[in-house]
Amino acid sequence: MKITDINVKTFRYESQIVRDDEGHTHPDPDLKEHKVKTTLFSIHTDEGISGYSFGVGKEITENVIAPILIGEDPFYREKLWQKLNHMQRIGQESLNDKVLSNVDLALWDTIGKILKQPINRILGLYRDKVPAYASTMCGDEMNGGLSTPEEYAKFAEWCIKERGYQAFKLHTWYPPIKWAPDPKMDIKACAAVREAVGDDIPLMLDPHHNYSRLDALWIGKELEKLNFHWMEEPMDESSMSSYIWLSD
């Protein structure tokens, strides 16, 4: 089996949310519908089986991805990933980790369809269910949204008591909100949620990689006091030295 073609289709649709340059989703403050777009990335084989994912651009596909994948066996997924990763390392800045991941997903989708098996079975089963947690959008400045710590607390309480979730994760405020990020404001929201849901509910915080080392350290210590389960990506995810520093 060989990969014979790679395609990217662009879809435009109406939405009431906006997405910033780093891919974060925000509610539109005016709640007005506007046109947004996304892409459907597809891998096609000589046996008529195709795999799909989202979010890969047309230019990077035509210039870099297609020349590497076309003619290859999709089962050589690891080899293809290593080739793309090498292209990233030698200066293909638009071939970022998100693009690599989406290409990898399409390859896995292709393999699963060939074998007629779900990917979790191909990778090796361990459990047949996983716990789910409720997760917010980012903070906003909208009435009735997530503009205050109290609104986070109210939403968390609703998710736990009314919807049956057994854990909760906050995404707090960040640009384009002018005053964000603000570590103290984030901790106020975390404290309000903890008070609302009680001591036994696992809580998590995702500060959107917006913080410095010292801010991340301070937030981490405050979250320890609130018995939070984890803090996700407080600093630039590509700065391994920052995470080594924080862990030490």
Regions found by a protein language model. Give the residues of each.
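Ligand-binding pocket scaffold of soluble enzyme catalytic domains
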Residues: 37, 45-52, 114-117, 122, ...
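Conserved, mostly hydrophobic/aromatic
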Residues: 3, 48, 65, 103, ...
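Metal-dependent enolase-superfamily TIM-barrel catalytic cores that perform enediolate-based chemistry
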Residues: 129-245
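Structured beta-strand/loop patches that form or line metal/cofactor-binding pockets in enzymes
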Residues: 1-47, 63
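Metal- or metallocofactor-binding catalytic centers and their adjacent structured scaffolds
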Residues: 44-115
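Glycine-rich, aromatic-flanked loop segments that form ligand/cofactor-binding clefts
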Residues: 104-139, 144
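Solvent-exposed alpha-helices and their adjacent loops that cap or buttress functional pockets
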Residues: 32-34, 123-126, 195-197, 247
